[in-house]
């Protein structure tokens, strides 16, 4: 396929550990700006190795990587949660490494942690956080650094349903804002990402994955209060979603991949977001 300017490119990448068989056997991959690539594959197939090389934390045995963005937001497969420093200090440290404004980065990370349902205090040492909260800190450091390349290894692992929906929206928004996005996912959640390209890594080679099931995308239910008439608000938001006035409130059913755009549009209208919850599987569409 043609490679767009600014794309991350892995060219004939091989990776071998010692005398073991090759983990990657001549992988070619391009991830363009505003593109999402989802890599699946069995355990031990080399997905994490592929992402480490893409992010720059590991080198290929042979082959080369070109076009890597100057700032990479990277969530590794084993995010280090054994640090003694408080989570807030860790996030400030990563922001400084990425040359981000400290105050702006802290605000952005705090907003994302709240949206993901982080429980407790960021003054708690990383080693004292639960696995789920540590994962959310890892996501915050990766997603809040204005990265041109986003590399996320199993980002939905350990997240509850509401947090998973929030992450879907943030990943889609990062691509919309111009980032190249490369993720792995064994939960099936990434199937809801809009316009993502799905690949499978097996036997050291990348191949297009079988087509995803054609069922409807998962929905979230958004409840709003808007300063204008609910019917007018519903009409204004109609391009995004099916909307239904409910008294002085507005209840909307939106595909998860479009929820971030809808929430931005609602805030632009002056609406208050009352709740965002996963829709029941048998909810009307």
Region annotations inferred by a language model:
Residues 1-28, 33:
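A short, flexible loop at the N-terminus of ABC-type nucleotide-binding domains that lies
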Residues 40-42:
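The feature captures the beta-strand-to-loop junction immediately N-terminal to the Walker
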Residues 55:
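Helix-to-loop junction immediately C-terminal to a conserved catalytic motif
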Residues 78, 83-99:
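Q-loop/switch helix immediately C-terminal to the Walker
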Residues 92, 104-121:
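Conserved ABC ATPase "signature" region
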Residues 139:
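Hydrophobic anchor residue at the start of the ABC signature
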Residues 150-154:
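Catalytic Walker B motif of ABC-type/P-loop ATPase nucleotide-binding domains
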């Amino acid at each position: 396929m043609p490679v767009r300017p600014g794309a991350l490119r892995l060219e004939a990448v091989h990776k071998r550990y010692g005398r073991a068989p090759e983990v990657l056997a001549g992988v070619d991959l391009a991830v363009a700006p505003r593109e999402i690539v989802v890599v699946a594959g069995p355990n031990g197939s080399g997905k994490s190795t592929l992402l480490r090389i893409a992010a720059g934390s590991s080198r290929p045995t042979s082959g080369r990587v070109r076009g890597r963005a100057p700032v990479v937001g990277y969530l590794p497969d084993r995010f280090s949660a054994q640090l003694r420093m408080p989570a807030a200090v860790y996030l400030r440290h990563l922001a400084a490494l990425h040359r981000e404004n400290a105050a702006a980065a802290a605000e952005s990370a705090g907003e994302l942690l709240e949206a993901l349902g982080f429980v407790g205090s960021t003054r708690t040492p990383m080693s004292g956080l639960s696995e789920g909260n540590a994962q959310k800190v890892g996501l915050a450091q990766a997603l809040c650094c204005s990265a041109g390349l986003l590399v996320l290894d199993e980002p939905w692992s350990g997240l509850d349903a509401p947090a998973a929906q929030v992450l879907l929206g943030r990943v889609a928004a990062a691509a919309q804002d111009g980032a190249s996005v490369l993720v792995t996912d064994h939960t099936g959640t990434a199937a809801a990402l809009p316009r993502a390209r799905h690949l499978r890594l097996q036997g050291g080679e990348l191949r297009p994955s079988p087509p995803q099931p054609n069922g409807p995308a998962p929905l979230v239910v958004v409840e709003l209060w808007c300063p204008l008439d609910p019917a007018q608000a519903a009409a204004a938001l109609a391009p995004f979603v099916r909307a239904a006035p409910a008294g002085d409130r507005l209840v909307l059913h939106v595909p998860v991949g479009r929820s971030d755009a809808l929430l931005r549009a609602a805030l632009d209208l002056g609406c208050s977001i009352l709740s965002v919850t996963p829709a029941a599987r048998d909810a009307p569409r």
